[in-house]
C-alpha cells in the first residue's frame, strides 16, 4: 500500500494530466484548462474573477509561452502549500 505522501503526489500529478489533456498539448495547461482546474479543484477557485486567473497564468508562465507546463504547475503547488501552511499556523 502506498504511503500518504506518495498518494498525495500521485494525485497532484493525475490532476495536472486530467486537465492538460483537454486542449492542445497534453503536457501543458492552457488558460482555459488552468481556469477549469482552479475552479473545480480548489475551494477558492469559485471566488476568483477571470482577471485574477489570467494574472495567475501570467505569473506562473515563466517562459511566457501562454501555457503552464508541469514545472510551472509544481511552482504553483509550492506557493499554495506555503499559503496553506501560513493559514494552519495562524489557526493554531
Swiss-Prot record:
Sites where the protein binds Ca(2+) 2: 61, 63, 65, 72
Cellular component, GO annotation: cytoplasmic side of plasma membrane; cytosol; nuclear envelope; nucleus; perinuclear region of cytoplasm
Disulphide bridges, residue numbers: none
EF-hand domain sequence ranges: 12-47, 48-83
One Gene Ontology term of the molecular function aspect: calcium ion binding
Keywords carried by this UniProt record: Acetylation, Calcium, Cell membrane, Cytoplasm, Membrane, Metal-binding, Nucleus, Repeat
Residues recorded as bearing N6-acetyllysine in the entry: 40
Location (main, coarse): nucleus
Compartments it resides in: Nucleus envelope; Cytoplasm; Cell membrane
Residues annotated for Ca(2+) 1 binding in this entry: 28, 33
Topological category with respect to the lipid bilayer: Peripheral membrane protein
SUPFAM superfamilies from the UniProt entry: EF-hand
Superkingdom in the source lineage: Eukaryota
InterPro entries, per database record: EF-hand-dom_pair (IPR011992), EF_Hand_1_Ca_BS (IPR018247), EF_hand_dom (IPR002048), S-100A6 (IPR034118), S100/CaBP7/8-like_CS (IPR001751), S100_Ca-bd_sub (IPR013787)
Pfam family of the protein (one): S_100
Subunit comment: Homodimer; head to tail assembly of 2 subunits. Interacts with CACYBP in a calcium-dependent manner. Interacts with ANXA2 and ANXA11 (via N-terminus). Interacts with SUGT1. Interacts with TP53; has higher affinity for TP53 that is phosphorylated on its N-terminal domain, and lower affinity for TP53 that is phosphorylated on its C-terminal domain. Interacts with tropomyosin. Interacts with FKBP4. Interacts with PPP5C (via TPR repeats); the interaction is calcium-dependent and modulates PPP5C activity. Interacts with TPPP; this interaction inhibits TPPP dimerization.
Protein function: May function as calcium sensor and modulator, contributing to cellular calcium signaling. May function by interacting with other proteins, such as TPR-containing proteins, and indirectly play a role in many physiological processes such as the reorganization of the actin cytoskeleton and in cell motility. Binds 2 calcium ions. Calcium binding is cooperative.
This protein's name: Protein S100-A6
Originating species: Equus caballus
Amino acid at each position: 500500500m502506498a504511503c500518504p505522501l506518495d498518494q498525495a503526489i500521485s494525485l497532484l500529478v493525475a490532476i495536472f494530466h486530467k486537465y492538460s489533456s483537454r486542449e492542445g498539448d497534453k503536457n501543458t495547461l492552457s488558460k482555459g484548462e488552468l481556469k477549469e482546474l482552479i475552479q473545480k479543484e480548489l475551494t477558492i477557485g469559485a471566488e476568483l474573477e477571470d482577471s485574477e486567473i489570467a494574472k495567475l497564468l501570467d505569473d506562473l508562465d515563466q517562459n511566457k509561452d501562454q501555457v503552464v507546463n508541469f514545472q510551472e504547475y509544481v511552482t504553483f503547488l509550492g506557493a499554495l502549500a506555503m499559503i496553506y501552511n501560513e493559514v494552519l499556523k495562524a489557526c493554531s
